[in-house]
Amino acid sequence: ALALRLGADAAVNTTKEDFRKEAMDLTNGRGYDYVFETAGAAPTMYMAFELAANKAHVCFIGTPHVDLTFTPKLWECMNRKEFWLTGSWMSYSAPFPGREWELTAHYFATGQLKYDPELIAEKLPMSRAQEAFMKYKVPGSVKGRILLVNEWAFPDIV
């Protein structure tokens, strides 16, 4: 639903049992020319390989925290598709804040960056940062992101 509100032509719920069929039906069984994996979770990384079309571009943005292993079947899938696999540097630039942060702020300020308030689950003052991080200890307990706000600079936001 969020992807559709932000302008996607179609969206597939990967928690549904038949999501692979639904996803492939959208491309008439061809697969996707561009696949961006942003979670960094092994299941979604494998899913990216499965959903990619022949000669596709697969980009990993998420950072995995477990080893990835490939079954012979998955390896064969990757080999036969001959896709391009690249990684993308996230938002760790130096000197801070870096060009990507400046561009993001510009596009947000000018309305060129589409944004949905549901992306932010909760706003907390910076003084409660430890509490915010603790909420993420239980997988799935936070839907969206927690925005930490510098309360002395933006007292009206928190």
Protein language model regions, located:
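Adenosine-nucleotide cofactor-binding segment
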Residues: 1-47
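Short glycine-/small-residue-rich Rossmann-like dinucleotide-binding loops
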Residues: 39-40, 62-63, 89
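C-terminal substrate-binding/catalytic core of Rossmann-like NAD(P)-dependent dehydrogenases/reductases
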Residues: 20-24, 68-120, 131
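Short, structured coil segments at secondary-structure junctions
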Residues: 6-7, 54, 81
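ADP-ribose/adenylate-binding Rossmann-like module
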Residues: 52-70, 84-85
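C-terminal hydrophobic helical "lid"/dimerization subdomain
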Residues: 46-50, 54, 99-158
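Short beta->alpha linker loops
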Residues: 14-18, 39-40, 96, 121-128
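Short, charged/polar "capping" segments at the starts of alpha-helices
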Residues: 1, 68-70, 155-157
